[in-house]
């Protein structure tokens, strides 16, 4: 056990060092310490005015109150050793917040009072001091921390409800004059060793209900008979993990909790919108508005009034005995109850941790037997004591037992619910897959209806098996309604998934049809036209003029056929008209996206240039009868080229806008797709591509949606096409000129006549002749093996190396002679002109291009 060292006790004549950890405000003999003002001066609280806060802790002995304060505020209150179970804190102790890491996150000048625990064996039945100390803490503190264990929630004495009742009663009599003077405090319940089995919200509700009932039973002064506990107290709740079993989580939770001890304001406008676990603790209405320099006298006056008041008498011995025995009997019967129920709770908890809640067989029989046994045993042994206490304890026991059984039942129903929904979903999916594998049409609605009946029947059997006899709360009608609703939701989701898959299959069919049909229409550009016979002005052939009309007609016919397929198949899913409307609306939007993607593919730079070139060559390379032209110098190549080029150029504006030839306007896409059905959800729209003219929030008009080629792209396409056409023109021009620039035949005869002597000399000389044959054979072999390139590169490399070696030898020769060094020095000092080193000259004696590039890099 760690005692309170460096604390100033009552009546001690101590120096400043003795106040290092705090002061004893009231000793175990109810004597108030007159040195409280000295301690507050040392801690520099006296000059703070109203800028201070007072917190007290309240709870049973040996429940870790001092330990909690030490962790929260860095204090050094005495705590109990693990090996002993005896009283540590005697009287009331005070210390200032010492937490260094709190920093600016915590409020300034937090004073903490550690109050002697209740229900201690050292005082036994003498509960006078614990009531007076609790009343003192309640009357002086802004925040009263009620430290209780999780298993004490719902108890009367364990949760100190009896003591709180007396404290509330006397507090009203002593300190509340009328309804206009209502000082408010915060009762901050810290629930220790919270395992998470019972949610904090449930524990909070239990404590709140107990306090409300407690308040309704106390006697109130005249004029306050109808007052409510909420008028005098606010409540806050927090749960902390087990300190021994979960030390890291405990310290983490305490650190987080300590940061809440700061000043704040509870804005009614944000009530319910802010997480209660992060709200500041200190509110303006809690402060007693006593200046710090007057607090010692105020506290001493409060204590004097409490000590000399006679209303704090103990309950009768009969009631105390009844409370003790009923609590003891309750604990005994709960031990047997735990032997049956605890393993079931552990199994459910383990299944929950594994993420696989399972239905426990024979759970209902075990719960009914355990409940009947525990109530019968308690009645047999406890009904002999005080009837009022017995009835109250019986109700408390029933609440504890039913709370645990209700949790078991609820988890069992949840497990049956979850497994039933999963089985239903799996069964429907398996039946659908089986129908798809057979290749035959299947009735989705019939499959869903059959599997739903099986799932509901199974859930009903499992729910009936866990009904608790005599328990008003044991009913599963609500759960069955929720289960039916979830099955309907799953059915709707499966139907939507099936319709999505249907829509995907139909979209693929639409894409394949449009890819083929629209591609053929674009391939018709330029076909069926004679070359120079094509009109430069006037009506265009159908392949160009009606291109967009044909594309739109193909598109609408294809989608209409797809809509019919979709509607016929959706009827077998038992889909509602709203779902069908949404599916058709999505299909039209998706189909337009497919068409637009196909158009963009056709007018991609490479594809459109190829089509324009084919269009141009069809007019330029072929005559009126479609016969390829053989260009002659006498042909009017320039005229034919100009007509063909200008005619092809006019195709670009035609492709730039999706317009119908009859109306010279874009097709009525917005009317064709239609408005979104009223039943469309955000999930239905999240994968849809925005369409101009329909989705106005995208800022894109219908005209922009129908723009296939922008002005900039048209200009770029025009330039590229002209370059391509110019290349074809130059090629044609060369072929025409090439026919008259052949070598004359007489030149070959003249070459043979003039070189006849040399030919005869080589043929008559065996050496020359053999050498010529060997050279020819070597050249052929080299050509066959593709070695000309490597040989040329090797020759170039060898010559370059020889040149470098020659330069180096020349440099060494010049450096070895006096005249050479002078010449080199003079050459290096030339102020003007370009210096060209020898190793930077190419084979022609000129500066190497690579050297010029390196010089530019140096600059």
UniProtKB/Swiss-Prot annotation:
GO terms for molecular function: GTP binding; GTPase activity. It is found in: Endoplasmic reticulum membrane. Cooperates with the reticulon proteins and tubule-shaping DP1 family proteins to generate and maintain the structure of the tubular endoplasmic reticulum network. Has GTPase activity, which is required for its function in ER organization. Residues 49-291 form the GB1/RHD3-type G domain. GTP binds at residues 59-66. Residues 850-859 have a biased composition (Acidic residues). Gene3D superfamilies: P-loop containing nucleotide triphosphate hydrolases. InterPro entries: G_GB1_RHD3_dom, P-loop_NTPase, RHD3/Sey1, Sey1/RHD3-like_3HB. This is Protein SEY1. Its EC number is 3.6.5.-. Belongs to the TRAFAC class dynamin-like GTPase superfamily. GB1/RHD3 GTPase family. RHD3 subfamily. The chain crosses the membrane at residues 743-763, 767-787. GO terms for cellular component: endoplasmic reticulum; endoplasmic reticulum membrane. Residues 764-766 are lumenal. It comes from Phaeosphaeria nodorum (strain SN15 / ATCC MYA-4574 / FGSC 10173) (Glume blotch fungus). It is a multi-pass membrane protein. Residues 1-742, 788-859 are cytoplasmic. Residues 476-496 form a coiled coil. One of its GO terms (biological process) is endoplasmic reticulum membrane fusion. It comes from the Eukaryota. Keywords: Coiled coil, Endoplasmic reticulum, GTP-binding, Hydrolase, Membrane, Nucleotide-binding, Transmembrane, Transmembrane helix. Residues 525-544, 816-859 are annotated as: Disordered.
